[in-house]
Amino acid sequence: MSNPPQGSSLASPIQAAAVTGDKTTLLRLIASSPQVIDQEDQLGRTPLMYSVLGDRRSCAEALLKHGAKVNRPDRSGRTALHLAAQTGNHRLLKLLLSRKADCTHRDLCDITALHLSTRHQDTQCLVLLLKYTPPGQVDAQDQRKQTALHWSAYYNRPQHVRLLVRHGSNIGIPDTEGKIPLHWAAGHKDPEAALTVRCLFEAAPTESLLNWQDYEGRTPLHLAVGDGNQEVVRLLTSYRGCNVAPYDNLFRTPLHWAALLGHTPIAHLLLERNNSPNIPSDSQGATPLHYAAQGNCPDTVRVLLSHPSVRDEADLEGRTALMWAAGKGSDEVVRTMLELNPKLEVNRTDKYGGTALHAASLSGQITTVRILLENRAQADAVDVMKHTPLFRACEMGHREVIATLIKGGAKVHLVDKDGRSPLHWAALGGNANVCQILIENNINPDAQDYEGRTPLQCAAYGGYIGCMEVLMENKADPNIQDKNGRTALHWSCNNGYLDAVKLLLGYNAFPNQMENTEERYTPLDYALLGGHQEVIQFMLEHGALSIAAIQDIAAFKIQAVYKGHKVRRAFQERKNLLMKHEQLRKGAAAKKREGENRQKVKVGQTKGKQKDADSMERQNKSNEQIIKNEVVHEWQGEASGNAEDRKGKHREENLETNHLQHSKHMAKNQRITAQIQSSPSEHEHTNSIQIRTSPSGTSNTQSSPLGNEIPKNMYWDDNPSQKHTQTRRTSRHQMESPDVVVHRIEDLIQKESRRKSHREERKGSHRQRQSSDYRLHTSEKEASDSAIHREEEGKKKETKKGRRTVAVTPKIEACCKGGCGKLSQSEKVSLGIGIQGRVDCITSPEPCETPSRVCRERKTISAKTGQRPLTETHKPPGKACRSSSALKSSLPSHIKQTAIDSKCLDSTLSYIGFGEAIKPLFPMGILREGSFFSKWQNIDIELIPVQARLQLVEREKARKQLFQRKNHAATVIQKAWRTYWVRKSSCKTRHSRSQNNPPAMV
């Protein structure tokens, strides 16, 4: 037969037989199976333990007789002896002790059978155990460091205490709380506990035991007062060495405990036994009166106030007992205190300026508020925060208190030190009914504090839908911004209150309001930062934008507006420039008219002299015809020698006469020119370009403006008669063939006729080019770019006259088209026009620009070479000068097509210094009246300030380039800024997602 398991159920046959006392069955089971004698159940108990629990002595004896283990413990570590002592069965206890049961065995809590024996009123078990307990094991301690004496004092067993003390138990052993057996005896509520206290104190009557303090500083008197055991208190205080007012760790005395718990007789007893004139206060500065007032113990308060040493003093926070009573709603105590002391200061303030009415309003004690208002309490008393009792009531939502305070004269329009009204505090507390009461009392629903926050923003911060709805129903504006630019929608989105967001948008809250901080966040940005997905989705559905999107839209609009502004500004500047040019043109025209008037006066003075010039021209024509006829007849041999001599003499006389007249005429013109130059009034208003000729008495060579040396005989000498004589001698001894002369004369006449017809054609083409000249006049940039382009083309063009070469540089060509006013003085000198002025009639095949634009004024430039200046005597005819036929072969190909004109020839040769030198090469008939060689005349022409216009154009160009760079830089910065914030937002979003959804373990 196999053995039964050790952990069988409680209903095993042998255990059932043991607990029921069925000895027959028990013996039969033991006989059939001896192994079941110590069989354990689920609790580890054996049949012997069950026989003890069932008080079955016969079964226990049978089990012990058949070899049951007497000291075998159960699962809690207790043996059959523990169970016998716990039940108080001294017969079984004696049986077990006789079978050598261990009385010092401890269970899992270190409890012995001696500890358990103190639970019963009968002392027989304790006596048996003390008889078998060794002397040193009487004070065996359990896990709480308590001995059998502690247990006896706790269960109020005075006889057990005497037995244990008689067997040498120590009454001064503290347990884990620092309490000795006297603490446990004094803390019993039974009045008979005084006997146990007396037994313990008589065992060792010392002051140290009487005033022993546990680890919290409490003495047996504290515990006796705490349990309200008046007999024990009277007994303890009756001993001479007892301290009536000991302090615990919180500096509270037994009187504090009595006042707090409302033990009026004990408080009266302690006041009688207290020999100190002062009532001590605890660590908070509170006296027993404070605790009695807080506990609503009017009798105790009356007892305390009747003692002469008790006064209503303030605690460390400055609060009196009346404030404590008002805060707890101790109406009876308040009435008692006001009754005992009619002059009590009801409006006395604490450390923070609060009164008893503040405390009652904060806790919502409506009855106390009414009592205080009836006893002269100020309804609008303010504390250090400038809060009245109404503020406290609104914050906590006490509607009845608010109505009572308003009825008692409290003002609803006051604000605290932060500028907040009671409505702000009601909204912060989420009290919708209080908000309605305050609005009904004419308080502004849009009142702003010193930070600009409204009650609606306070309610939105907490997500209080009821308050928000009440405020907006009463016309509260949801779009009001605080000092940082935040609205109620910002706070709702920041905290993720979807219902509040829906409510605000339903009342037309602006979803894209930006704050005033550096970040300029919108409500959507706050929702994104908080990761509130539902709020984000709802805001996007209602047109919300982030600050990045708003900046993109604003940048696009700003650029469009700025471009329009730039166009308007450029148009206005161009308009101003044209108006300025028009003013300059009108001024130049006025100066021109003034010069013409002066010229008319001069022409009237020279009319008589003009007649001499006309007669001289007619004489030249006749002389030319005579020379032609003479040459023809001489080579044909038809005339005789005498006739030839007579004709030669006659011709010489005529030529000499003509040259003398011409010399006189030139001298007169030079004197007139000198007079004009010496006139200071005319010199101030006229700037004319003076053409230099070769002075008499200079060296054999003369430097031309182009840098080449020209022989002296190339200039027209100051002595025309001598020059004419030399020419006559040359023509007499070196006479060309008549065919050559006639051919040359006819060629010149044909060219003259072609020049006239070509001039008419050029006039028509010139009218067509006037529009392009006007565009050139309005666009200086094109002229400057053209000059730079010609400069880069850079190959010098050379012209030849005889064996001399004239170089035409790109700067000369630019000067010909743009005017010499665009060149500096050094450039003019280097180009050969520093003295003469312009060479555009030589280098350019195109007609010169209009006199009003280019040739309005010619300046007098003093030559540094020492040559005598002469006055220019012509105006380029027809606005387009042509090059002469004499230089046609040596000029570039694009100049060779130009027809000859005598006036243009004179002016051209005068510019380059060849006028007088090549005059004898042309017949006198070709050089008509008004040419350089026959007429001297001064003409005043006003120049347009080209350099000033160039400076304006360059300045405009630089300004446009600077703006383009700034615009490009601004675009780059905006793009970088948007990229940065997009990256930052995406990083935050990924970070939040990674925190919310951590990666799964692989």
Swiss-Prot record:
Interacts with apc2. Binds calmodulin. InterPro entries: Ankyrin_rpt, Ankyrin_rpt-contain_sf, IQ_motif_EF-hand-BS. Residues 586-599, 609-621, 643-656, 733-763, 770-796 have a biased composition (Basic and acidic residues). A motif (D-box 2) lies at residues 959-967. GO terms for cellular component: cytoplasm; cytoskeleton. Pfam families: Ank (PF00023), Ank_2 (PF12796), IQ (PF00612). Its main location: cytoplasm. ANK repeats lie at residues 9-39, 43-72, 76-105, 109-140, 144-173, 177-209, 216-246, 250-279, 284-313, 317-346, 352-381, 385-414, 418-447, 451-480, 484-513, 519-549. GO terms for biological process: pronephric distal tubule development; pronephric proximal tubule development; Wnt signaling pathway. GO terms for molecular function: calmodulin binding. PANTHER family: ANK_REP_REGION DOMAIN-CONTAINING PROTEIN-RELATED, TRANSIENT RECEPTOR POTENTIAL CHANNEL PYREXIA. SMART domains: ANK, IQ. Gene3D superfamilies: 1.20.5.190, Ankyrin repeat-containing domain (1.25.40.20). Residues 670-680, 687-706 have a biased composition (Polar residues). A motif (D-box 1) lies at residues 486-494. Signal peptide: none annotated. The D-box (destruction box) mediate the interaction with APC proteins, and may act as a recognition signal for degradation via the ubiquitin-proteasome pathway. Required for normal renal development and establishment of left-right axis. Probably acts as a molecular switch between different Wnt signaling pathways. Inhibits the canonical Wnt pathway by targeting cytoplasmic disheveled for degradation by the ubiquitin-proteasome. This suggests that it is required in renal development to oppose the repression of terminal differentiation of tubular epithelial cells by Wnt signaling. Plays a central role in convergent extension movements in gastrulating embryos, a processus regulated by Wnt signaling. PROSITE patterns: ANK_REP_REGION (PS50297), ANK_REPEAT (PS50088), IQ (PS50096). It is found in: Cytoplasm; Cytoplasm, Cytoskeleton. Keywords: ANK repeat, Calmodulin-binding, Cytoplasm, Cytoskeleton, Developmental protein, Repeat, Wnt signaling pathway. Residues 586-804, 862-886 are annotated as: Disordered. This is Inversin-B. Residues 551-580, 966-995 form the IQ domain.
